[in-house]
Amino acid sequence: MAKSSMKAREAKRAKLVAKYAEKRLALKAIISNPTTSDEDRWDAVLKLQGLPRDSSAARQRNRCSQTGRPHGFLRKFGLSRIKLREATMRGEVPGLRKASW
């Protein structure tokens, strides 16, 4: 089970990503636009670098909603493989059951 501080850190990152998403998108559009002048592009790059590091979506880590486990995460369910198996065995996941052939 992940430390509660790790879960809190990920929640904080998610808030920052949501807060700065529009600003980051606008700056990236200015930077990637070929008609933008070099001065405007450089200003946009500096502003983008000035944003908080954790406001980048690439720094987020998918974690299990129950345990906070970062590995073996299944995006469709929001759970780690271990917790998904336990929930499946209890019959809590509709349409999912143990394979037998």
Curated annotation (Swiss-Prot):
Provide the family line. Belongs to the universal ribosomal protein uS14 family.
Instruction: Provide the Gene Ontology terms for cellular component.
Output: cytoplasm; small ribosomal subunit
UniProt KW keywords: Ribonucleoprotein, Ribosomal protein, RNA-binding, rRNA-binding
InterPro entries, A to Z:
Ribosomal_uS14, Ribosomal_uS14_bac/plastid, Ribosomal_uS14_CS
Organism per entry:
Shewanella loihica (strain ATCC BAA-1088 / PV-4)
A Pfam family this protein belongs to? Ribosomal_S14
For this chain, one GO molecular function annotation is: rRNA binding
Q: Name it.
A: Small ribosomal subunit protein uS14
GO biological process terms held by the UniProt record:
translation
Task: Note the subunit structure.
Answer: Part of the 30S ribosomal subunit. Contacts proteins S3 and S10.
PANTHER family in the record, alphabetically?
A: 30S RIBOSOMAL PROTEIN S14 (PTHR19836), SMALL RIBOSOMAL SUBUNIT PROTEIN US14M (PTHR19836:SF19)
Tell me the function of this protein. Binds 16S rRNA, required for the assembly of 30S particles and may also be responsible for determining the conformation of the 16S rRNA at the A site.
